[in-house]
Amino acid sequence: REPPGGVILDPKGDYGQKIRLLCEKYGRASDLVVIDPFDQRRSIRWNPLDSDDDELELASRFGAVLESLGMSGGENTFWIDAAQRVIRHSISLLRFTNPANEPPSFRDIQSLVSSFAAIADRTDQLDLSNPGVEPCLSFFGEWMDMAPNQRSGIQTHVTNMLDPFLMEPYATAFSGTSTIRIS
């Protein structure tokens, strides 16, 4: 199956019905894929972190979402950039330590951001002979040594970015292995 040609955010559901009718009219109803957290039977599962894109690209998407929501500019830029950085390195750490074919999850990122024990558990699993783990270890060393007020500010931004994905029904719809890859 080809990847979708576009993604439409339709929280109210009224636009989706119009698109469905249009697809049916042109014989393309089978090409329409839907992410509907409230109706898992008709929905695909899509984990935005289940992607071959690098960690920087994935984290940058979250920053772009915050900017589109009007959270950019001025003093927020520092916090958004810092949040993207911790998300990027969290994705990297999860990719190094998750079982094969298990993509990172928002819940695991939140756990790393909020718990030194979770970081220690994951970093203890790293293969230190792999030179790719060094930036990840270095970042989390800085994270643990960071001034508590600064770390708390970053944690707040990350929590605000991830929170919707941690609650049902979104936690199920946007986790695990994706039904199809969108990106």
Which residues does each PLM region occupy?
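P-loop NTPase motor domains
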Residues: 1-183
